Regions:
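Helix-turn-helix
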Residues: 8, 16-58
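Small-residue (primarily alanine) positions within well-ordered alpha-helices
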Residues: 12-13, 156
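Hydrophobic alpha-helical connector segments
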Residues: 54, 68-100, 152-159
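Amphipathic alpha-helical packing segments from all-alpha helical-bundle domains
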Residues: 80, 116-142, 154-157, 184
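Amphipathic C-terminal alpha-helical segment
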Residues: 92, 139, 159-177, 189-199
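Amphipathic alpha-helical segments used for helix-helix packing
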Residues: 95-117
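Long, low-complexity, intrinsically disordered segments
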Residues: 218-250
Length: 250
């Protein structure tokens, strides 16, 4: 029995998990589908749990590393590369993939509370993504492309979590359009939050449409997005002679 047989089992089972989840995975059906003997299957994986652990370690982990591969060891062009990854997520989305949802998110919700080994392995997959993005953000700060006040780890966690959330909301709505819209909003939001003023124009070619105000201010999103990281605008208010209030900034 060769290593290629083992890899084939893992890949086919990963695809089955993507489609219907881990709990519904039937090893007997996969054995029949692969046209291998039970002996060959159980030679590699003595039980379903061991199969699941191997799928996470050997298929899911590299799958998610590859998603963010363009950010690994990057030194310049971080914001543009990050926005491009999100653009790719929109491009490759299909009605079927959206209805299935994100396989990592699905498995976290399905298995992390019933099997702590699963939880730990799924956390590793999550953390690998966070570390790639975190390192890239730190490089962007050093290059002067990203704002210095950005907390790299918190922002990396936020990005991974936001994308997982986009998949989850779109899955429950069974709507590719919702996914594309949400990720587009995420792109605009990240540009506002992350990119230093001097580097803002360099990422405009991969972002969604924006409009510029008549006063010449920096581009504003056409969709009203609340920026959770922005400081509120300070206004100086004084009482008028009529007893009302007015703002000097009006």
């Amino acid at each position: 029995m060769s290593t290629s047989t083992r890899q084939l089992i893992l890949q086919r089972c990963f695809e089955a998990i993507q489609a219907k989840g881990f709990e519904t995975l039937r090893t007997d059906k996969e054995i029949a589908r692969l046209k291998i003997t039970k002996g060959a299957f159980y030679h590699y994986f003595p039980n379903k749990a061991e199969l699941g652990y191997a799928v996470v370690d050997e298929v899911m982990l590299p799958y998610y590393e590859q998603k963010w591969a363009s950010l690994a060891n990057i030194e310049i062009g971080v914001a543009k590369a990050l926005i491009a990854v999100l653009e790719q997520e929109k491009t490759k989305a299909t009605e079927t993939s959206i209805k299935r949802g994100d396989v990592l998110t699905n498995m976290i919700l399905e298995m992390s509370h019933v099997d702590d080994i699963f939880r730990q392995k799924l956390e590793v997959v999550n953390e690998v993504q966070v570390k790639i993005i975190q390192k890239a953000i730190m490089s962007g700060r050093i290059a002067g492309e990203l704002k210095n006040q950005t907390d790299a780890r918190s922002m990396a966690l936020y990005i991974v979590g936001q994308l997982m959330g986009c998949y989850t909301i779109s899955k429950v709505r069974a709507s590719k359009e919702t996914f594309v819209s949400m990720v587009g909003t995420m792109q605009k939001q990240l540009k506002d939050v992350l990119v230093a003023e001097t580097a803002a124009s360099k990422v405009s070619d991969v972002t969604v449409n924006t409009v510029t105000s008549p006063s010449g201010d920096r581009p504003k999103s056409t969709i009203g997005v609340v920026n959770p990281f922005a400081k509120p605008e300070e206004k100086t208010e004084e009482k008028s002679t009529r007893g009302g209030w007015f703002s000097r900034n009006r």
